[in-house]
Amino acid sequence: MSQSNIVRLDSRSNAQAAWQTLCSRADLVANSGVVAWHDGAQVALFHLPDNADGEQLFAIENRDPKSGANVIGRGIVGSLKGELVIASPLYKQHFRLADGSCLEYPEQRLQVWPVRLIGDEVQIAAG
């Protein structure tokens, strides 16, 4: 599996990963973030139902690397330089949703997880 956390939403199997249900589709907020616990980490989930590339779901670390605060799930989703990004609500740095890299500060990076929607379940790759 690549470093990207983009998984086709109609994908039902992946021999490389074991999937764990994290929450339900009803828990998601369109074009915004919600936060869930996964293996001791806070994971911010961003659901983009009407994106130009089709419905997409991203799972990215909730902890801002500059401040140490768990606030990424409260950030603003947007597009910058052709990339889908989340802007940290504190210092306004932009992180790519696809791979967690920071556009302004290359040394900052957020962890990402493969994630998918199967029916009404949001599943995240375990391990």
Spell out what each predicted region is.
Residues 106:
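Active-site loop/oxyanion-hole signature of alpha/beta-hydrolase fold enzymes
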